[in-house]
Swiss-Prot record:
Protein name: Probable protease Ga0182885_104520
Taxonomic placement: Bacteria, Pseudomonadati, Thermodesulfobacteriota, Desulfuromonadia, Desulfuromonadales
One GO process term, biological-process aspect: proteolysis
Annotated SUPFAM superfamilies: Caspase-like
A Pfam family assignment: Peptidase_C14
Source organism superkingdom: Bacteria
Molecular-function GO terms, alphabetical: cysteine-type endopeptidase activity
Function of the protein: Probably a dedicated protease for substrate gasdermin bGSDM; cleaves the bGSDM precursor, releasing the pore-forming moiety, which integrates into the membrane and triggers cell death. Involved in defense against bacteriophages. Expression of bacterial gasdermin (bGSDM) and this neighboring protease is toxic in E.coli.
Family affiliation: Belongs to the peptidase C25 family.
Organism of this sequence: Desulfuromonadales bacterium
EC number: 3.4.-.-
Amino acid sequence: MQNWALVIGINRYWRADACLKGAVKDALKMREWLTSIDGGAVPSRNLILLLSPHDDPESCGGASALPATQDMIIQAIEQIFRKSGEEGDRFFFYYSGHGLTARMSFSNESGIIPNDFSDTLTNKALSLRSIFERFQSTRFREQFFFIDACRNIPWEGEREFLISQYPLPKPPKPPVFPQFIMYATSPGVKAVEIHEAGNERGAFTDALLAGLRGTGNAKLWHEEDREYMVRWDNLFRFVEEEVIRRRLSVSENRVPPLIQEPRQFGERGSCNPTLASLPAEVFPEVSLDVHLDPMTVASQTEVIVGDLGGVLRREFPVTALPVHFDLQPRTYSIRTSTPDFRSEKRYYQVDLYGPAEVSIKMVPGTGYSTPVSPSSGVSKSVDGNTATASVLMRSHDPLAYLELLDNSGTTIETGIGQIYRPRVKPGFYRLRLRTPEGIPHERLVELSSGESADITLDAPPQTDSGLFTHIAFTSHMYQGEPNIIQPSEAIGPAQSMHLSTILALAGGAVNEDSSYGGKLRGLGITSFRNIAGEEATSGMQILFGNEVTAPAFTDNYLSAVRLRCWGIDRGIPAEYRQPLHVADITGLAQATWEMEPGSYLLSIELPDRMPVVFPVAALSNRLSLLVVTQDATGVVNFFRYLPSLKDELPGDPRYEAARFPVLRRLEYIQRSCMVGRFEQAYQNARELLNAKWIDPMAGLLGSYLLMRLGKSDELCIPARNLSECFGELSDSHVIAAEYEAGIGNEEKAADAFRRALDNGLPIMSDCLTKLIYGMERYGIEHPRAALAKSYYSHGIKGLLWSACPRKACEAAPGETGADA
């Protein structure tokens, strides 16, 4: 199979002040790398180039290009599909030009702006998500998207904005092949051009091309192949660090200034593909300076530098500090040997891909001063014989996602909480802890021959996000470490928590009769039964958290929220409710409904967005718990849970003291799903699927992940459990239908799809999509078929949960007010 590419560069726009200078140049440079045999290895005939202007020999450098209009972008993609048969080894998509993020109710839709876009023809903007989704239905084994574009909302005061979708959609075909997406900047933020006369270029593309050429730490040395590799993870880290290093301000009159920061996205597992392989002789030596503290030990100290092949350089006696070495770029181990002192650490590792300094602290004593023979090194024992090593890596947090990688970035093993690898070759390894969003925190370690290492990884410090920090400190959840929170004794130390995590746990704790959860109940959230009555057995509770920093704005914002809830077969009610503020904590509010078991619709009307309607399932003896958070940048996230209202066993095998801790794991899974980290989410969901006690939300999320990962043959037990125990959930029957269809039971699949409609609408967007395709496949007629099709056709894309703008349901009613 072959590689394919679409390259787009747009300088010319509808107004002179909207035009760019460097986008076409960047696109031509990217085309040059893509068609190079040492780069993307895309045959010229397999690459389509779209430029604006496309017919100016001076700006286009003589390249043959087509105009970069919306129609031509779509036609170019379809042409690649026809020529390739929608399959290949790799597909590359590069875009340089203007972009935007349009606020679409509960989601922010990022799009590119073709040449024919204008402030009146705004529908010419093209949704990136819809392009990504279309490629998920193809068989390109690795898909790379590089987007050098702004993602800021285009005009001051514009809140809702239409971005056109890719007009020829197809559903994804599990298992979807991995997508690697790199954005020049964060949602809602500009991307900056570097203005040098005659050499204008995008800061992002400038760093990207440098990384693809192997600059700095974008590359890693592969010992077995004796060459450098530029892999995705290191490439993104290099681009991110390089753009941030330039501190490109993208805001005016803001303190602190808003800085351009690249972001990555994409549905992928632990894949870390190689984008370039480069020979050793291409790169010059780099400098390493070793400092000794105290300096007085220098005259009796030997400094030894080694790599995987053994000792490379020695310096004895040390006559001057720092000790200077010029070495080939790669990973090194530094040791010292001295009679009366030892280094504070046995060895010091350094990724030497740029000039570096290492300071070695020397303390009185012996212990690491065994003479090192010329044949010894990190891969050999002192006598020259190689013995395997072992490593136990763990986290303070039992739910943390861990990765063990070799020195070149190849994944060896992944796990939750800890990984034990008993027999590994001595050498350098990379130990990673990833947040639910996939942000890595890496530690480089060296395993010597025969060594048994026990290493605890720390997560990145908690982000200072205003309301979250206030709650954590005032509730005494911090335990002295900036990256560890302890929300309850039933949970213990936890990392990578968000405001949504605390609200989910608090919502669970206040609705459970447990001796645990005192800090969480102290937030002041009222339990469902304290509002609905002790006899209530089913209903809904919504928790709102707003992290905008201005208290007056936050209070006014939450006071303007309106909520409506009605039976699925009824009309939208005129009466609305408003959430009640949680006492003493600005930014928190709650609303509660008692409900009979059944299927409902919920309209959430935020003051700066279109009203959005979500399907809601009220289950017997369970609470439909919804958590809605808005961060300081205006991004709204929506989380769902179905905790029990009666006494039962805990649903999480790692937390047996109470039931509410399972909500933390479910929140982590949802956060990973929101950014496409499905393999990471599945590691956590798999334990819940195998647990003794069934949690309906764990079943839904776990089954969703099985389907996304192409593991539908494993749906048998989850589908049966959901259908038998939680048949009131429409999603349960969609999952059962998918399983039956997968094993060829067409009649049972059709019956299950009908039962899904009998029980309302699926609450998960993926299940709604599968229901629609099932209805079409089996010709299903049902009184709710039109409703399901309407929700699907008007649905808000990019959400984990089914949602539809309320205006797509029917005209808004007259309004009366009532508190929740």
